[in-house]
Swiss-Prot record:
Name this polypeptide is given: Small ribosomal subunit biogenesis GTPase RsgA
TM ranges: none
UniProt-annotated location(s): Cytoplasm
Quaternary structure (record): Monomer. Associates with 30S ribosomal subunit, binds 16S rRNA.
Native source species: Xanthomonas oryzae pv. oryzae (strain PXO99A)
Signal peptide limits: none
Entry's family note: Belongs to the TRAFAC class YlqF/YawG GTPase family. RsgA subfamily.
Record-listed E.C. numbers: 3.6.1.-
PANTHER family: SMALL RIBOSOMAL SUBUNIT BIOGENESIS GTPASE RSGA
Length: 363
């Protein structure tokens, strides 16, 4: 890392959000508390630690904050790929506030949040046009993205391997009506992948999410113009992938953007902070507000605007069923979150360290 003042133009090339020093009060306060420290971005996250960078070409292994090593330290308060940190030599001394993020409820019975990526402009939700194609899973990803401040874009790969790409787009037309961009492409073809260029401009950061075998690593290699990321095929019987990406990593692209590739995720649990309207269901939520009863379950109640829309072929009944399922999951997670916050507030009086829950603002 450099021992002089920050080189902000170079930092901008890896996603620094301003042309000079930080302009947000919360960031200024952290800088003021660590006047000898320099900013860097987390570009890799491993079980054993982090790799950070302050230029597109140079990176180093970083020593994390001691409290991050404690087993009970909240995982979402540790640094994630895309986070900005302050460094003194090789030591991380502070985590800067997140401007955006995508999170999920971590696997297990106890309530935990896991940050998938931080300080991102765009989330590419990648799904293959083979047996991997699953509109319900796409909707689940959209729910996790909604409210986190980033722009979702649905990317349908393997368009060269099917004659039914237009049919798949038609299935998702209710999403496109909500201004959620959809792109069907061949992840191996640079001309086809150029459809993503509007979201990969200089200084912007995007993250790829999706199941194993969806084509995320292939897409990364095409955007890089080189075979940097290892790729494997998928099993022919079910089109399931083999986890070619094993850790999250931030990669500078020739376009000037940064791309975060992530391992495939089998479990996509809500955190309880999601907004269904912002998470791809604004049309269903708007109709639900017109139902005769405030607690309408949208099953057989009189005056149900949602059922009326289904019967008029204006809404996909399977999508509405998924909406209702996700609504229950979000409510359940919100109850667990409220319990956790209450426990933390009680911990303040007992001298225990409370675990805050970050809520990124929209950029």
């Amino acid at each position: 890392m450099s021992d002089i003042s920050p080189d902000y133009p170079t930092l901008q090339s890896i996603g620094w959000p301003w042309p000079g020093p930080p302009e947000e009060a919360a960031w200024k306060a952290v800088f003021a508390a660590h006047p000898q420290a320099l900013p860097a971005r987390v570009v890799e996250q491993h079980r054993t630690g982090y790799v950070v960078a302050d230029t597109p070409e140079a990176s180093l292994k970083a020593e994390s904050l001691p409290e991050w090593q404690r087993p009970r330290f909240p995982s979402h308060e540790r640094a994630a790929v895309g986070d900005w940190v302050l460094m003194e030599g090789k030591r991380i001394v502070a985590l800067l506030p997140r401007r955006t993020s995508i999170k999920r409820g971590a696997a297990g019975a106890h309530y935990h949040q896991q940050v998938i990526a931080a300080n991102i402009d765009t989330v590419f939700i990648v799904c293959g046009l083979d047996a991997d194609f699953n509109p319900r899973r796409i909707e689940r990803y959209l729910l996790l993205v909604g409210g986190g401040g980033a722009q979702p874009v649905v990317v349908l790969t393997k368009a060269d391997q099917t004659e039914h790409a237009e049919d798949a787009l038609a299935v998702l037309e209710e999403l496109e009506a909500q201004n959620i961009p959809l792109r069907a492409l061949n992840a191996k073809d640079p001309a086809s992948v150029a459809a993503l260029r509007p979201w990969l401009g200089d200084g912007r950061t995007a993250v790829l999410v999706g199941s194993s075998g969806a084509g995320k690593s292939t897409l990364t290699n095409t955007l890089l113009g080189t075979e940097k990321m290892k790729t494997n095929g998928v099993r022919e019987n079910d089109s399931r992938g083999r986890h070619t990406t094993t850790h999250r990593a931030l990669i500078p692209l020739p376009s000037g953007a940064c791309l975060i590739d992530t391992p495939g995720m089998r479990e996509l649990k809500p955190t309880g902070e999601e907004d269904l309207a912002e998470g791809g269901f604004s049309d269903v939520e708007a109709l639900a507000a017109q139902c005769r009863f405030n607690d309408c379950a949208h099953i057989a109640e009189p005056g149900c605007a949602v059922r009326a829309a289904i019967e008029a072929d204006l809404l996909d009944p399977e999508r509405v069923a998924n909406y209702m399922k996700l609504r229950v999951e979000v409510a359940s997670a919100a109850e667990k979150l409220a319990t956790r916050v209450a426990q933390n507030n009680r911990g303040k009086g007992s001298g225990k360290r409370p675990a805050s829950i970050d809520r990124p603002g929209r950029r």
